[in-house]
Amino acid sequence: MPLIRNYDYYDLLNVAPSTSAHRPTVMVTSSRSYMEPQKSRIYYGKNEWRGGNTTIHDPTEFEETTMDKNANEIAGDDKRKKKRWRDLLFPNSRHSSRKDKENSNVSVATRSLSSVSFRSEKPSRRRESGSLSRHRYIPPPPLPMPPRRIMTSTSMGYSDDAMTSSSSHTTTDYDDIVPVPTPSYVIYPAASIAQASRRQQQGSAKNRIFRSPTYHHDAFVNSHEWTLSRSISEMKLGIVGTSQSGKTALVHRYLTGTYTPDESPEGGRFKKEVVIEGQSHLLLIRDEGQQHLDVQFCQWVDAVVFVFNVCSIQSYDSIQALAHEMSKYRNISDLPLILVGTKDHISEKRARVITEDEGRQLAAQMKRCSYFETSSTYGTNVERVFKEACCKIIQLRVRSQVGAAAAASSQARTPTPTHSESGGRKDYQDPSRYISSNSFVMPSNMRPSFPSNSTRRNTVHHRGEHPQQQQYQQQPPSSSRTASERSMSAMLGTPYGNRMPAGVSPSASQKSVHSIANGCYSRSSAALLDSDTPAVNSYLIDSMSSAGFPLSQSGANQVSASTSHLPTPSSTPNTQRKNRRISNIFRQKDHQEEKSKMIESLNLGIGRAIPIKQGNLYKKSSKSALNREWKKKYVCLYSDGRLTYHTNLKEYMDKTAHGKEMDLKLATIRITGRLHPLHSHRVASSVDPMNGGGGGGTPTLKSYEPRRSDVGANSGDGTSGGGSDDAIKENQRQHFSPPAMPQTVAGKKKRESRKIGTNSKHNDEEDECFEVINNCLMRWEFCAGSLEERDEWIQAIGGEIEKSLGKEVANAKTNNRAVANRPDIAALRSIPGNGRCADCGNPSSEWASINLGIIICIECSGIHRNLGSHISKVRGLELDQWPVEHLAVMQAIGNDKANEMWEFGLLNGERKPTPESSREEKERFIDRKYVQKAFLKPIASGEPVTSQLISAVLARDVMSLNVLLANGMSVEEINTTTKDGRTVLHLAASIGSVELAQLLIWHNADAQILDNNGRSCLFYARSNGFREVFDMLVTAGLSPDYGLPQEINDFSQMPEFFAMGSTSNRDYSTSGDEMYGSRRISMGPPPQVPARRYLPQQPELDETSVI
């Protein structure tokens, strides 16, 4: 079946055809078989010929009436057609005629862009007059060309300064056409051939619009939607290095956040908006793909990043050559430089050959150069490199601004050029070296006062030409100077405003003097930042001020002036952009709000907890008892119950310093000199309104708190300045002081060690100090500036102490573990043997050993505690809380069953202690019983221990399991796994036996072991719906999602019983508390137990041998 490939480029080029008949189609047919189209295909745009007997027919040689001819006639011309098309597609493969060579360019362009329409019709035997050959290729009607652009090379791409229209003749120039990759095609059935051919116009085709791919690329780069506001400054960064240096991956990682191993030998030019300290900047990145740096690149950059590969000595050695070559065209001593070593290619097969010390040594040889090592694969230090480059560019501009301000404040003088110094200049200092070919340097007496528009547009201005050339080009007569120029002259302090400041570096001299004086390098020469815009970062201004650079008032007052007449060497788009609209794609309505929030977040810090109260307090030194001084500290109180202090605010701002810290959960606060902590705050006194607040009036005391020093009474009316207006004026507050008492030792010490730096008068009652004491008796004694400040700190710290203690109580109350109620605990006494002590038989038993499963008296409980919790875990029946797993163990064992196991070998001559026995006798018996295990029941012989262990778990036989565990099974035996990797703890969790799982956990069963499917015991407890087992395992230290599949995210979503994985392959299943299997487990009497324990060496357990 013939296939038609529709190469639709209209969607790609965004060009709509005039009619549907012009849609380009290509037909590929095979003369051998319609079922083998894959053997005869032509791949356009790839210069590749595949297939054997393939014919591609020219639509100009076909007619509608030839559709009915026999297909054999078409096959007869295959050989000739194939040869002719091969010659057209590959003109260099043979000696072609002149006419064929002329047509070859058209055919290649047509082939690469799929602008030729082909249809499946039979060839016509017509002959045209004047044709050179019967089979001469007649090109199809070409697509009408759009107005062709004259590409003028700039530093950042192309600019369409002039537009021309192409002719509609068939000999349209396609020299500027760049082949594009072949897009995806659509396969249509052969039935659509006739319909497509009827839509094809037989007359003269109308001209179609054709646009070169470079047009769309430039339109994307220079689009208004991708331009920022005119007030956004540009920062031009150059990236240089060899093709093996990894610079392409570095730039790609910074722009896209992804890694690409492919290197781009031709380089690239990119834009990105960066925000530094809340200010937006447009970063222009130029990846220089050439091995040799040219003049234009060296004069364009504001900073350079030299990139080398730490695995390549060649790329490392090329850095010095590149720096030396750049020094010919640019003074790099004042140019920000960054040396980057990429570690992307380090692997086992390719080791590192350039050490970090060698890289830093090379950076030290290059002045003003920082060194970084990056990894584009993981993104290490990539953002830091470009941020450092941006900061260095801004610092350089600050220095240029300071130099301009200093030059403007100095006395103006007319510059006198000195041409005799040109012999000693370097290349970058020669102004006549970097003039474009479109202009020439005129003698000083022949230069016009104002450069023409064409001169300004076509001249490439470089940094080296300003000191001597630009001053002549910008010296107009005073009568013809514009208002903007006069204002700029007044700002700069020069008669014509054209003398360059002495402090301007060559990297800044490319900009106009107006931009330098203003301190902002704007993307638009007609826009300058006003005085309200923070063009310079605050930290940079501080650094410049500290370095000794004066910031004059003239430099601070920025003047807005129009500089549209000045040339723009490298901005994008061209200089006519001042009349274009400004896109708001980067400036939304809430941009200012987002910027303010960003600044606030930066000021707050990243990753730092915000204190609820902070400030300066005096702290008494506690290092030496002889020399205790008051030192000023910066104290912070946090909401998580922490109190910290730092030496000063600077240390607090440093994120690496944590200061001294105290946990308030274990602390209390009190006022210095008082026995008890302060629970109520001092309340200001109120004066009786009947007395009018006079000196004879007696104030009413609302709240009074006795002090240790308040022992005696003072002479007079018993008050200390109670209603005196002078006292109120002195203290600036109404405050009632209790009756003054004789001074104590604490008051005397306080007066002797009064802090330095306060000018207010203090009496003995105004005690602004307080203490914070923790459980380790560590004292922090602070002193505030006033009583009000002291009370605020006491209230805040006391509130945090209360809150911390409340959280602990709430955590204990909101524990998710199920706790047994009192009736269930009381029911433990009804278990056989629990009515008396398991060791001495005392009927008054209020304590229990939960891991042994016995109830004991209070005296025996003390002895059990001395044994250690690894042997006996003692709990009170009435005092402690009982989780359900502890209660389940107690219900499963009991005193009688436990004594049958622990006193199994008790000899007739051994006497068990009674309640009246001495403590020493009880201690000796309990030690032999539980520590030495002298009477313990041994393990049954004849069967592997691990097999008995799994049999006991599957049978829910707690006592058999207890015997095995008490006889001292090793950790390896307890954690023995089956063929699918499950342990006995997995089995206990799958059957929902919380008592068995708890006993295994107490005997060092590893709950973190996963089976062969990566599932933990939590998975089996959750999948079978055993919530108690799940909570017990989480309490044992497992994470709630440990060893669980991702689709299981909530316990409440799981069914009550759901067996997954290898559970279906077992020969048993569970349903509630029942156990069913293919072979029932023998529940008969226990086997005969030998006199001694038998523990043979056991191999790994096979689960099938247990059941």
Swiss-Prot record:
Residues 610-802 form the PH domain. It comes from the Eukaryota. One of its GO terms (biological process) is endocytosis. A zinc finger (C4-type) spans 837-860. Residues 159-171, 467-491, 560-573 have a biased composition (Low complexity). SUPFAM superfamilies: Ankyrin repeat, ArfGap/RecO-like zinc finger, P-loop containing nucleoside triphosphate hydrolases, PH domain-like. Pfam families: Ank_2, ArfGap, Ras. Keywords: ANK repeat, Endocytosis, GTP-binding, GTPase activation, Metal-binding, Nucleotide-binding, Protein transport, Repeat, Transport, Zinc, Zinc-finger. Disruption phenotype: RNAi-mediated knockdown in a ced-3 n2436 mutant background results in the production of extra A/PVM neurons; the precursor Q.pp, which is normally fated to die, acquires the fate of its sister Q.pa. Residues 88-176, 405-509, 551-581, 681-764, 1062-1107 are annotated as: Disordered. PROSITE patterns: ANK_REP_REGION, ANK_REPEAT, ARFGAP, GLD, PH_DOMAIN. ANK repeats lie at residues 980-1009, 1013-1042. Residues 822-943 form the Arf-GAP domain. Gene3D superfamilies: Ankyrin repeat-containing domain, Arf GTPase activating protein, P-loop containing nucleotide triphosphate hydrolases, Pleckstrin-homology domain (PH domain)/Phosphotyrosine-binding domain (PTB). This is Arf-GAP with ANK repeat and PH domain-containing protein cnt-2. The lineage of its organism: Eukaryota, Metazoa, Ecdysozoa, Nematoda, Chromadorea. The gene is cnt-2.
